[in-house]
Amino acid sequence: EEIKKSTGGNPPPVFDPFAGGGTIPLEAQRLGLKAIAADLNPVAVMINKAMIEIPAKFQDRPPVNPAAKSLLAAEWQGAQGLASDIAYYGKLLKEKAFAKIGHLYPKVKVPETGQEATVIAWIWARTVKCPNPACGCEMPLVKSFWLSKKAGKEAYLEPIVEDGKVRFEVRRGKGKVREGTVSRTGAQCICCGASVPGRYIRDESKAGRMKARMLALVADLNPGRGYMPADNFHIKTADVEKPMDYPEQEMNQDTPDLVSGRGYGITHWHQLFTHRQLTALTTFSALINDVQKQVVADGGTKEYSEAIATYLAFVVDRQANYSSTGNAWSGDFIVQTFGRQALPMVWDYAESNPFSDATGNWDGAIKWITLAIKRLPCWKSAKVIQCLAQKDNGVRNVLVSTDPPYYDNIGYADLSDFFYIWLRRSLKDIYPENFSTMLVPKAEELVATPYRFDGSKQDAKEFFEQGMFEVCQNIYQYTMQEFPVTIYYA
């Protein structure tokens, strides 16, 4: 009412030319205003479509899945019907995936009970050969040997050196836990104690001689967790061929925000995933098309099936965030790949089980997304466009509210590629214009990144400031003169 009163009963649409994660357009829609979101980054564009554009198209519609047909008499408000279908078809996709790759995620026998338990994580460490000629141990690079620090349930790995080799046993309680073997400056050989400089580790990785070794398994004992050393069966099960259709896109090797820019010879995105992880993610992604056809068979329109596919593609993206070699094991759970706005090297990592009930599982990703969808406002139509903020996109008579990029604070385009490669696989046939490039567009991204200007901070600064000047000129064209423009710059 206050908005109507302040706008003469005719509130203008709210336009954000740097929509990003969609907060401003979403909250404008929640206030009952038409929202228009724009961004150059296709990942941001898809996030905004999923939050403000798609739900508004299918507002108050009942689901089409067979399980919900007995509830058709019920009132489906907002995006509840959409959420119901995402949950149903997400479960169907999981069942199809398990039929194909479930054997790659076997259970483990718990020694104390003889019962089988679901593995929720496999703990791995990267390894390089010790440079000491008298040693030559395949030395594990471990940040911490702790498995659990939970009071009364402490567990840790004890490395045992025998005949120049190392094996691991799981110990419980508050024993003397060995310090980790790797730091920012280098590592220490667990067998001979030799100090190993970081440059040697980088050179070994560049030469393709860095390996990975499974150290332990974490099992769901329901209740509680069980920890046990890796066995040959689980090691062999994890040793699968790389899938034929893995994502082959290159990583940016000029930015320190990515591990590819830190001298380890990591040059392509697929190198951030184990072969088992690649197999799972490509399988989930490929099955979206099958499920999309099932939506149509159950009575949904083609457009509606594409909407369901869009959300399932985001489930795959969320799955990828918990299914890479960038997932540390900390605090008794798997840490997401993007614990911060960078992709550093993670020495000892946790491989999740998408078919478990713990962190990194498919069901959890579905639940997270459907809970969010149920709470979306979706009562006003919205528009999302992919465009360059420095160019006039033709929007007029709007109220502009935006949170622009901050010089070189965050390289969103470089980081977004992690999610883009999976979204593109799943959605390029539905949104060909948004996924026309192999990677996220970067050259025109409005950030002051020196590496894009041969290392010149001054040129990067001038590019950013000139670009922001052009953006402000465009905003003057877009906005209704009787309303102020709000720009958040902290």
Q: Where is each model-derived feature located?
A:
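Nucleic-acid modification enzymes, centered on SAM-dependent nucleic-acid methyltransferases
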Residues: 1-15, 25, 29-398, 405, ...
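Nucleic-acid endo/exonuclease domains
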Residues: 458-463
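Conserved SAM/SAH-binding loop
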Residues: 21
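A short glycine-rich, Lys/Arg-flanked "PGG" loop and its adjoining helix->strand segment in the class I
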Residues: 465-483
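Conserved redox-active cysteine motifs that mediate thiol-disulfide chemistry
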Residues: 18
